Structure formats: C-alpha cells, structure tokens
Amino acid sequence: RIGDHALDIYEFSLKLEPYKDLKLDEIEGLSLFVVKMIENSIKAYVNKDYELAEKVIKDDDYVDEKYAEIIDKLSKNEYSIDGKCLPFAIYTTLVVKYLERIADHSVNISEWVVYISNGFYKDKKIF
C-alpha cells in the first residue's frame, strides 16, 4: 500500500510540474516527516522497539494536523491560487491525502510492534 501511494504521489507530481512556481514548502516538510515515520516504524519492527513504535503513533497527530491545515488553506485560497490553477489545488490535495495515508500505514506497523511487545493492540489485550 505504501508503494502504491508513493506511485500515486509521483504521478500527481508530474501533473503538478506546470505549476512548480506555486510550490508549497509545507508539503516538502510534511513529506520528509512522513518518510521518517516510515523509517522509524520499520526500525521499531526490526528491533522490537516499543518506545519508537509509540513515538510513530504519536507523530501521526502532527501529520493529521498538517493535513487539515494545508487542506483548509487550499479551500480558503490562502495561497492566492488563480482560478486557472484549480488543477494545482486538486492535485496538491491528493498528494497531501496520500502522505497522510502513508503515515497511517506507518502507525499500523507500529501498533503491531506494540502488540508484539506487550500483547495490547489499540489499548485492548489480545491473545
């Protein structure tokens, strides 16, 4: 799934090429943050690192906040996007949504690390 979303992001980035002057720095920062979440969730799984898994789970709150913030700004046109640039807003929305979904997949990996560590999955004891 993460790979599918990454491919979708790549395809939308090609469609965003004509609008490169409208680049949003927030998306680059968000993407780097999400990549770090992926790395940390895999590292937590390999090393059975409960604390790192918990960090990834908490980091998702930041991604959710940034997602909502960017979508809100796009919907209110706070980026002063010309009406001719509607595709920019649409493709950017999709890119940000896929980044948020990738972060969610990192959380899923981390939730299973927590389960492996203590038998709890989403705060419920499972045997």
Regions found by a protein language model. Give the residues of each.
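Cytosolic, long alpha-helical scaffolding segments
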Residues: 1-127
